Swiss-Prot record:
It is found in: Membrane. ATP 2 binds at G869, V870, S871, G872, A873, G874, K875, T876. This is ABC transporter G family member 31. ATP 1 binds at G175, P176, P177, S178, S179, G180, K181, T182. May be a general defense protein. The lineage of its organism: Eukaryota, Viridiplantae, Streptophyta, Embryophyta, Tracheophyta.
């Protein structure tokens, strides 16, 4: 006992001693100057030499800028754990400032009489056809010259709106699609683009936007999640924090520390360290990133890369949270957040909004957030609501009075109705009547304009008007509230951060650079064996020409190797534009590090080439000349990288940038002095010769070689060396100083081009091709002065979807085409997949992973069934298994259709599957998409008129009549809104007249009103007697209770409920409430949310109940089993459904339908077709004027070489451009075909052959454009035979290049990988085509590849068809010997005119070869994994 007392006494004295030591440490810290004290803090850590235990921590003085990752994590965990929740944590921060009477800067945002108008095209004029594209370009040019201002219709987006966004209050922005929410947020953030007409005033604390920097004062969180896919979540947030800086945090902290010291206040140690670390952010610490990851739930994926469609990374919901968190690590006092909950479940959205609410209240921030479908508990977190529709503000004020305003107008929110949903639906003409509560008076539709006018007389509206009438007192503005600096960190720090960021990206993309190095090494090895020194001589001018070809190929390779910068930069541009617009850093802070970091790659590539080729080829052996070649290739590579960065920043679109890059490369090479000699370039193009980097490289590398000792022998008794004769004969300079002129010029080009890259990145914006579709009624309502038109499409990025006006449809039971109602039963379904290697590495020993476990159920005609479960429960997996959409894995169990075993080929004909991704051909209109689907999926005996009537009935059923002529477009880019695209997906399946329809998440990503429209569509379909099943993710009460039956799955792929919902979900609620311990549902609470909460994994652990086992033991399970047993037996009078053929249509009907669609798609894809034609016109004019009358010059060997050079350059560059530009087009169409082929619309071969066929007329036009212009300007011999031969070879050459691009896309997963696979073959075709080294000079071991090279056959045909029959004298390069063109072509190249027919057959044969391989790849290769 005495020992115990002594121990307690020692413990007490030890604690007193610790307290004294802590007091001494604090006193020592307080004696430091304030600035030094801001960097030091007391951090609780284990006593030295002891393990961390509860209550056994000691305070240690630390530098807050140097906290270890473990200390940062532990500090954040302690703070949030001690506070209990985020609200208490923010309250502690606020209390610390209040204790010393420091106020936070407040910002009030006002907008008065704000009007924003867009200019749009209407009707068929809005479709992106080739003629419309040309008209748009012409009109834009004339408008720029102020000559023409017509052609477009004005559409109001925001119509004279006014309001106040108050500090310390959370504002919710609600409104239906196309109401102007995004435009309002962009306008308030000072981010509207130049294409809109804006009037009105926007002020922050009474200051106009031009008096400060709004991009630094506020932060706009976009709907788009643009991030560097190679970076982890932590790295993304840390980089954003370093760029944005700490703003006023540091100054406020210093003042706080000064006042606390004066008043003798000792703050909490952990909170003190936390606030100091946040105020010193932007240096090396990342505590703010750690904190944001913790409160946003991103800590579980902190070290996971962000990823994209190519790289597996974080989920879509996590990416959306990262987008928000990226700006919260900054110092903006005003937050504009645009639909930040897309892809998030309601619980996560609630936590995020809750954090923002407490942050706004405690720190006096100003926050406005637009949400799609806020849950009731989320809606309650907001202080104010702004309700906007048709560009007019209907209500703005406290959330509590919004319902009262509409009640005064005669519209009441039902008891079980989400208020946010009510506010959006009450403005809709389709939904308004159900909320009318003045039954004594007849209902009349109240328009948005009437609501807006009524609000002005409402008490809240009057108060708002009175407040706006009194100008903001600018003297109340806190001096630190509005940012006047463009950037939050010093320029040097930004440069350093960018350097580290880009270095990290280079390391993460190291496989690209390694692949380029390996590719260059392989080509260097091939070059070494082609120009092998044992076959290379130095005896004549002809030998010199071979060396010139080798040097030229080296230059071309180094120049070509920079082309990958185009795709790499275009992929990064959205991120760079986002960073630029948010004022993360100036563009030069990005371009300078990118230039510096490219130096090592240039050193490696040029060094590798010289090291492998120089001495093996047999160049001049002097070491100084070897170093000279290395130095020259290094600066050429730097010039090449800069040139293609300029083209990428100028093009800004992959297809356009690739075209620009090809054009730049072509201009540089054709005027470089090798393909066409200097003497042969016309006077009007000689300026191009002098500004071509290739010219300086060609002259410098040639002088470096041919003035060497190896070429010093005297030439033909003349007073010059052989080397000088070669230089002179090829129009090259022979003075030594031209080497240094070349090096200096290339260095200068690298500097100038990098400057232009910076300039374009600063001045140019993303190409504004984002569009939306607005219905005819809507645009007439908004702009009554406009003449009637069908559709308005071209709204850029300011309208993201459309409101749909019309009348409710009656339930439809009969349609023009009958169908057979069918049921589907499935029993004991199990599904297994192979365990991925990454999971095995984590300790999983099984070879197979089971995703579905003994799932049993049934879907019946006229019954709408919901398939619900948390993420990972297996909802989509089950539906894919039942629909036969899985491409891998093992399936067990039985599936029957109306009692007969399911046959997949038959089932495809009678079922429809609406995928979540809404994949459609982007260049078709709505009605064309439906007619196309109906043509291929309805039986062949259905005539055209009946098919058309049926399609129109389906359009009426899904409410798409008003949008029949609208372009489908690409998701998030142009065309239909998300909600309209959902309904199109349903309609496309419905026109197949299916008996069973599967729908995967039909309401995901939609606002409440759009979701209601989609569900009304679904209910209409069910009422026709079809069998429908939908997966659904946490639906609202209205949506959930529109279903008849429910299949509820828990994580792991097990059913825990299968049966009817009952009225107001009574059956479901009674089933789960009968389980002991399950909490009862609250009145008015969403049954879907309740059932997910009470059946969670945590609840299972608390209750000790396995809900799947409970269901299997229940009476409900027995009833389901009995129903399945009954439906699994066919009726006596029934027959098994069979079809005579696999597809509805025969082969040629499939081919004709696919060709019809592809023809429309090509006609409406001007970025591909029109740009290709425009590029061809420019190239043909340029080549024709450069090669002026080349075809009529036939006196010397150089004349033949010049003509061949022009043909070679045209074939190679126009061909490669065709191959590159077709790859994204084929990739999109192949992606669409995966869905269409899975639906049984057609087989692979008709689809592939339609893509091959549709190119024929476009390539023909391209060939005619180039052939006619170039042939005329080049003055080739105008005979019918020679001209037709020229057109023939150009046509089939461009055709096989295009088919080659299609083939490389078909054999690779996507159009990003396709160019990488295709590029090495372009290089080999270039090397072995016979231009740089004739066939007779190619070593015997490589000569076979000359015959396997399609470009060599093209040059054979083009040159021989034009010059192969000429008998006139031809002067050779030595200036002495003469021969005939026939003999020269035969002796030098091995070309014979009588072989022309075989050559033509070979060129056409390559077209057939590539087309067949493309078709077979489409048929047998499937890169979609489900």
């Amino acid at each position: 006992m005495w020992a115990a007392e002594a121990a307690f006494a020692r413990s007490g004295s030890w604690r007193e001693e610790e307290d004294e030591q802590e007091a001494l440490r604090w006193a020592a810290l307080q004696r430091l100057p304030t600035v030094a004290r801001a960097r030091r803090g007391l951090l609780r850590s284990p006593a030295p030499g002891e393990d961390r235990v509860q209550g056994d921590d000691a305070l240690c003085e630390v530098d807050v800028a140097g906290l270890s990752p473990g200390d940062r994590t532990a500090l954040v965990d302690r703070l949030l754990a001690d506070s209990g929740d985020v609200e208490d944590f923010f309250r502690r921060i606020r209390s610390r400032f209040d204790a010393v009477q420091i106020e936070f800067p407040k910002i009030e945002v006002r907008y008065e009489d704000l009007t924003v108008d867009a200019y749009v095209h209407v009707g068929s004029r809005a479709l992106p056809t080739i003629p419309n594209f040309i008209c748009n370009m012409t009109e834009a040019f004339l408008r720029h010259l102020r000559i023409y201002r017509g052609g477009r219709v004005k559409l109001p987006i925001l119509d004279n709106v006014s309001g106040i966004i108050r500090p310390s209050r959370m504002t919710l922005l609600l409104g239906p699609p196309s109401s102007g929410k995004t435009t309002l947020l962009l306008a308030l953030a000072g981010r509207l683009g130049p294409g809109l007409k804006v009037s009105g005033n926007i002020t922050y604390n009474g200051h106009h936007l031009n008096e400060f920097v709004p991009q630094r004062t506020s932060a706009y969180v976009s709907q788009q999640d643009w991030h560097a896919s190679e970076m982890t979540v932590r790295e993304t947030l840390e980089f954003a924090g370093r760029c944005q800086g700490v703003g006023i945090k540091y100054d406020m902290l210093v003042e706080l520390l000064r006042r606390e010291k004066n008043e003798g206040i000792k703050p909490d140690e952990d909170l003190d360290v936390f606030m100091k670390a946040l105020a010193l952010e932007g240096k090396q610490t990342s505590l703010v990133a750690e904190y944001i990851m913790k409160v946003y739930g991103l800590d579980i994926c902190a070290d996971t890369i962000v990823g994209d469609e190519m790289i597996k990374g974080i989920s879509g919901g996590q990416k959306k949270r990262l987008t928000t968190g990226e700006l919260l690590v900054g110092s903006a006092r005003v937050l504009f957040m645009d639909e930040i909950s897309t892809g998030l479940d309601s619980a996560t959205t609630y936590q995020i909004i809750k954090y923002l609410r407490h942050s706004t209240h405690a720190l006096d921030g100003t926050t406005i957030i637009s949400l799609l479908q806020p849950a009731p508990e989320t809606y309650e977190l907001f202080d104010d609501v702004i309700l906007i529709s048709e560009g007019q503000i209907v209500y703005q004020g406290p959330r509590e009075y919004a319902v009262d305003f509409f009640a005064g107008m005669g519209f009441r929110c039902p008891e079980r109705k989400n208020v946010a949903d009510f506010l959006q639906e009450v403005l809709s003409k389709k939904d308004q009547q159900q909320y009318w509560c003045h039954y004594d008076y007849p209902y009349q539709y109240v328009s948005v304009s009437k609501f807006a006018e009524a609000f002005k007389t409402f008490v809240i509206g009057k108060r708002l008007h009175d407040e706006l009438a009194v100008p903001y007192n600018r003297h109340r503005n806190h001096p630190a509230a509005l940012s006047t600096s463009n950037y939050g960190v010093r320029r040097l720090e930004l440069l350093k951060s960018n350097f580290q960021w880009q270095h990290l990206l280079m390391k993460r993309n190291s496989f690209i650079y390694v692949f380029k190095f390996i590719q260059l090494l392989l080509v260097a090895l091939i070059t070494m064996t082609v120009f092998f020194r044992s076959t290379m001589h130095r005896d004549s001018v002809d030998d010199g020409i071979i060396y010139l070809g080798a040097l030229y190929f080296a230059i071309v390779m180094i120049l070509f190797n920079g082309f990958t910068e185009v795709s790499l930069l275009v992929t990064k541009l959205p991120i760079l534009y986002k960073h630029r617009d948010l004022h993360f850093y100036p563009p030069w802070a990005y371009t300078l590090p990118s230039w510096l970091l490219s130096i090592p790659t240039s050193l490696i590539e040029s060094g590798m080439w010289v090291l492998v080729t120089y001495y093996v080829v047999g160049y001049d052996p002097q070491f100084t000349r070897c170093l000279g070649q290395f130095l020259l290739l290094f600066f050429l590579h730097q010039t090449s990288l800069a040139l293609f960065r300029v083209m990428a920043s100028l093009g800004r679109n992959m297809i356009v940038a690739n075209t620009f890059g090809s054009f730049a490369l072509l201009v540089v090479m054709i005027l470089g002095g090798f393909i066409i000699t200097k003497e042969s370039i016309p006077a009007w193009w000689i300026w191009g010769y002098w500004i071509s980097p290739m010219m300086y490289a060609q002259n410098a590398i040639s002088v470096n070689e041919f003035l060497g000792h190896s070429w010093s022998q005297q030439f033909a008794n003349q007073n010059i060396t052989l080397g000088e004769a070669i230089l002179t004969g090829y129009g090259l300079f022979k003075e030594k100083y031209w080497f240094w002129i070349g090096v200096g010029a290339l260095f200068g080009y690298a500097i100038v081009l990098n400057f232009l890259f910076t300039l374009f990145l600063t001045l140019l914006n993303p190409i504004g091709n984002i569009q939306a579709v607005v219905s005819k009624d809507d645009i007439q309502h908004r702009a009554p002065r406009r003449k009637n038109g069908k559709l308005a499409l071209e709204l850029r990025s300011y309208l993201h979807s459309a409101s749909l006006n019309g009348h409710n449809l009656k339930d439809q039971k009969g349609m023009v085409l009958p169908f057979q109602p069918l049921s589907m039963c499935f029993k004991n379904i199990n599904y297994y997949v192979d365990v991925p290697a990454e999971l095995k590495s984590q300790g999983i020993v099984e070879d197979r992973l089971q995703l579905l476990i003994d799932v049993t159920g049934a879907f019946r005609p006229g019954i709408l069934t919901a398939l619900v479960g948390v993420s990972g429960a297996g909802k989509t997996t089950l539906m894919d298994v039942l629909a036969g959409r899985k491409t891998g894995g093992l399936i067990e169990g039985s599936i029957t259709i109306s009692g007969y075993p399911k046959n997949q080929e038959t089932f495809t004909r009678i079922s429809g599957y609406c995928e979540q991704n809404d994949v459609h051909s982007p260049c078709l209109t709505v009605i064309e998409s439906l007619l196309y689907s109906a043509c291929l999926r309805l039986p062949s005996h259905v005539d055209v008129n009946t098919r058309r009537v049926f399609v129109e009935e389906v359009m009426e059923l899904v409410e798409l009549n008003a949008l029949s002529g609208a372009l489908v477009g690409l998701p998030g880019v142009n065309g239909l809104s998300t909600e309209q695209r959902k309904r199109l997906t349903i309609a496309v399946e419905l026109v197949a007249n299916p008996s069973i329809v599967f729908m995967d998440e039909p309401t995901s990503g939609l606002d409440a009103r759009s979701a209601a429209i989609v569900m009304r569509t679904v209910r209409n379909i069910v009422n026709t007697g079809r069998t429908i099943v939908c997966t659904i993710h946490q639906p609202s009460i209205d949506i959930f209770e529109s279903f008849d039956e429910l299949l509820f799955m828990k994580r792991g792929g097990q059913l825990i409920y299968a049966g009817p919902l009952g009225s107001k979900s009574r059956n479901l609620v009674e089933f789960f409430e009968a389980i002991p311990g399950v909490p009862k549902i609250r009145d008015g609470y969403n049954p879907a949310a309740w059932m997910l909460e009470v059946t969670s994994t945590q609840m299972e652990q608390i209750l000790g109940v396995d809900f799947a086992e409970y269901y299997r033991q229940s009476k409900l399970f027995q009833q389901t089993q009995e129903m399945v047993d009954i439906l699994s037996r066919p009726r006596r009078e029934s027959k098994e459904l069979t079809f005579a053929t696999k597809y509805s249509q025969p082969f040629f009907a499939q081919y004709a339908a696919c060709l019809w669609k592809q023809n429309l798609s090509y006609w409406r894809n001007p970025q591909y077709t029109a740009v290709r034609f425009f590029y061809t016109v420019i190239i043909s004019l340029m080549f024709g004027t450069i090669c002026w009358k080349f075809g009529s010059r036939r006196e010397t060997q150089h004349d033949i070489f010049n003509a061949m050079g022009a043909m070679y350059a045209a074939v190679l560059f126009i061909g490669i451009t065709n191959a590159t530009s077709v790859q994204p087009v084929i990739s999109i169409e192949r992606f669409v075909s995966y869905r269409e082929r899975a639906a049984g619309m057609y087989s692979a071969l008709p689809f592939a052959f339609s893509l091959v066929t549709v190119e024929f007329p476009y390539i023909l036009v391209q060939s005619l454009i180039y052939g006619t212009i170039f042939y005329s300007l080049g003055s080739f011999e105008w005979t019918a035979v020679k001209f037709l031969w020229y057109l023939f070879f150009m046509y089939f050459t461009l055709l096989y290049f295009t088919f080659y691009g299609m083939m490389t896309t078909a054999i690779t997963p996507n159009h990003t990988v396709a160019p990488i696979i295709a590029a090495p073959f372009y290089t080999l075709w270039n090397l072995f085509c016979g231009f740089m080294i004739p066939r007779k000079r190619i070593p015997a071991w490589w000569r076979w590849y000359y015959w396997a090279n399609p470009v060599s056959w093209t040059l054979y045909g083009l040159l021989t068809s034009q010059f192969g029959d000429l008998d006139q004298p031809l002067l050779l390069a030595d200036g002495i010997t003469t021969t005939t063109a026939v003999d020269f072509l035969r002796d030098h190249f091995g070309f014979r005119h009588d072989f022309l027919g075989v050559v033509a057959g070979m060129v056409a044969g390559f077209c057939v070869l590539f087309a067949v391989v493309f078709a077979l790849a489409i048929k047998y290769l499937n890169f979609q994994r489900r």
